[in-house]
């Protein structure tokens, strides 16, 4: 039986493609760098933002500046260029009713994650939203989940992580949690299996079916 369920945000609860990729394009443009298409930037959805910029920029030198420029646009515009995946509210309502403790665990800065959860009126489903600090503290998913488990007083052996990228799965496993991967976000089935996901769900409703079986 699972006592607590942790959901990733980007690519699991909401589809943030437009807001994230447009804000990355804005930052790159401000840095006078080549600007890839939005589809070419979807690999950036999920992992810590700074690490994605380090990869794109080829080093650490301007990564912090790129993050700051990204947030110029994201904080005012990109945050809301986002949408909740179909059936997510149904899933959350059902799990809340079945007495599972629900949490958000995202590498996104908590100040933005909180605003997204409030904007889409998802607050009532979650006991707490755990995210990174603006300085990058706890952007690593393993560190974030360790912090969340401790602060929520959750036994990792009775907790489940739901996410769409490998770092969600790896972070959970490092903390002794079970982890389920979803295919409707931005990670591939191969990525999730290789990371060690215990189960793969193609749709949000499949997530509910799987979790309900664990709780019931």
Feature roles, as predicted:
Residues 123-138:
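A short, structured active-site edge motif that brings together acidic residues
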């Amino acid at each position: 039986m699972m006592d607590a369920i942790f959901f990733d945000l980007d690519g699991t609860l909401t589809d943030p493609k437009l807001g994230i990729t447009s804000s990355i394009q804005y930052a790159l443009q401000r840095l006078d760098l080549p600007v890839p298409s939005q589809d070419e930037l979807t690999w950036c959805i999920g992992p810590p933002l700074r690490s994605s910029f380090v990869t794109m920029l080829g080093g650490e030198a301007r990564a912090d500046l790129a993050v700051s420029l990204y947030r110029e646009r994201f904080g005012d515009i990109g945050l809301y260029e986002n949408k909740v995946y179909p059936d997510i509210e149904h899933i959350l309502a059902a799990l809340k009713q079945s007495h599972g403790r629900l949490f958000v665990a995202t590498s996104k800065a908590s100040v933005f994650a909180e605003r997204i959860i409030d904007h889409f009126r998802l607050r009532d489903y979650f006991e707490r939203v755990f995210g990174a600090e603006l300085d990058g503290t706890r952007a690593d998913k393993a560190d974030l989940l360790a912090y969340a488990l401790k602060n929520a007083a959750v036994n990792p052996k009775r907790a489940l992580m739901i996410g769409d990228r490998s770092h969600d799965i790896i972070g959970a496993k490092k903390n002794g949690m079970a982890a389920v991967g979803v295919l409707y976000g931005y990670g591939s089935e191969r990525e999730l299996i290789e990371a060690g996901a215990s189960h793969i769900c193609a749709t949000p409703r499949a997530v509910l079916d799987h979790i309900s079986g664990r709780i019931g």
